[in-house]
Amino acid sequence: MEHYGLQTAAGHLTVPAESKEPYAADVEAGFRADAAQIIARYPQKRSALLPMLHLVQSVDGYITGRGIDLCAELLDLSTAEVSGVATFYTQYKRHPNGRYTVGVCTNTLCAVMGGDAIWEAVSEHLGIGHDETTDDGLITLERIECNAACDFAPVVMTNWEFFDNQTPDSTIKLVDDLRSGQDVRPTRGPDKVVSFQEMSRVLAGFLDGRADQGPGAAGASLAGLAVAHE
């Protein structure tokens, strides 16, 4: 059964044609080489499934049927087993994703600190709702749950990089800068936000050396830790 695609109003999934097309020979060879490195990290092959799914997204931009088939083959799993995992976690996208995934935290603290207002403003500004993508293919917008950064609420994530203490205006500027092609630096971590596919490769375990370019744990977090130790 095919599980990947856009859901229609009737509840059916429409699957992009390229989702089922075989990989080009050179692309598949590169995938298999990267997969071998991932699998070698684990005592059991099936344990490599999560990073393997990120690898699929680094190649295709979302979880494709061909990616599912290749993961199943390489890990000695059924396609149903792979599909079950890929449909459980929200980081795995079942239809083409934008270059940047912008997630607005609307969990309790972020919501009361302004997350709901940010969501309404940026959703209206972009003309899209949850898990929808702008017509230019650049921004996919999401409501997200807590990212363990409550001391910087409200928080917006872009390809899983932190943008702390956001406002409706700052978030609208963020998405406008991304769409105009400007380099955008998150509050913490790397010196700029990379694309969804580039970040997916990092999440597959192929580090790009950017994580420590900026501050990691910020002052408020460290102050809280010090109080907890007293």
Q: Language-model segments: which ranges?
A:
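Signature of N-terminal electron-transfer/Fe-S-associated modules in redox systems
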Residues: 1-230
